[in-house]
């Protein structure tokens, strides 16, 4: 993140944003006349990435709470399919909870508002995990679990996209939800408007806008996997979390009642 201009420039990495401690540029070497651009000198610490996982980021904002409840739940009889995990491949530990779908890459997590999720639940199209726990019929439990997990998967896309890093129109990104008909991942379409905002259009053609309330968008995250002694980083993934003003849907069947 870069703020200011001229000789008054402040730069922040993920860690500096978390700590609200931007770094000041002390000297600027301008070599543009020779075609080499500019070099910026920082006398303080180096730029660092975020230390917070997606899970920790979600826990710190009430506005993310309904999505977090869905992400944190799961089937106790098939934990390998739950989306949050504290251990990867039974040998790599996490700081707290990692998203199991992440694989040494960068991602975007779109979080619908609590109101949007609650409205879907009231309509009977998006169950909660308590509905799963209360169900006794195995087929019903299977339908409920799949409806929740697939809903979550469609809100996670490959590639981190931010408000403020330029403009782009009609760019498709794959999500983590697989289309069983063609064995390809469903996509979303992103339109970035520079510093003015960003919209996401789902597979049904409905457009959702990123909520640009301070602290609820562009939240940088990094998830680590350590060896069992927690002394060495085995791998890590980057992600950004945005609050959006409605849910994303990939299929009309999602709008049918699950019961």
Language-model-detected regions and their locations in the chain:
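Mature, structured domains of secreted/extracytosolic soluble proteins
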Residues: 1-259
């Amino acid at each position: 993140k870069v703020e200011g201009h001229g000789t008054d420039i402040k730069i922040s990495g993920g860690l500096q944003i978390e700590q609200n401690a931007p770094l000041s540029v002390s000297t600027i070497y301008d070599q543009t006349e020779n075609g080499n651009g500019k070099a910026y000198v920082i006398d303080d610490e180096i730029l660092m990435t975020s230390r917070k996982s997606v899970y920790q980021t979600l826990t710190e904002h009430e506005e993310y709470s309904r999505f977090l409840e869905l992400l944190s739940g799961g089937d106790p009889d098939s934990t390998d399919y739950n989306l949050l995990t504290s251990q990867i491949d039974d040998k790599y530990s996490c700081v707290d909870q990692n998203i199991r779908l992440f694989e040494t890459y960068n991602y975007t997590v779109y979080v619908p508002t609590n109101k949007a999720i609650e409205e879907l639940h009231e309509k009977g199209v998006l169950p909660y995990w308590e509905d799963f726990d209360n169900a006794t019929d195995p087929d019903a439990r299977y339908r409920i679990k799949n409806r929740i997990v697939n809903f979550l998967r469609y809100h996670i896309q490959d590639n981190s996209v931010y408000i403020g890093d330029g403009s782009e129109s009609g760019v498709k990104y794959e999500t983590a939800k697989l289309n069983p008909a063609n064995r390809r991942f469903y996509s979303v379409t992103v339109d970035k408007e520079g510093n003015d905002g960003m919209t996401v259009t789902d597979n049904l053609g409905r457009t959702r806008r990123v909520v640009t309330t301070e602290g609820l968008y562009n939240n940088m995250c990094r998830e680590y996997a350590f060896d069992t002694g927690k002394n060495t980083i085995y791998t890590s993934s980057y992600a950004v979390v945005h609050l959006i003003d409605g849910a994303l849907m990939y299929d009309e069947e999602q709008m049918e009642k699950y019961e």
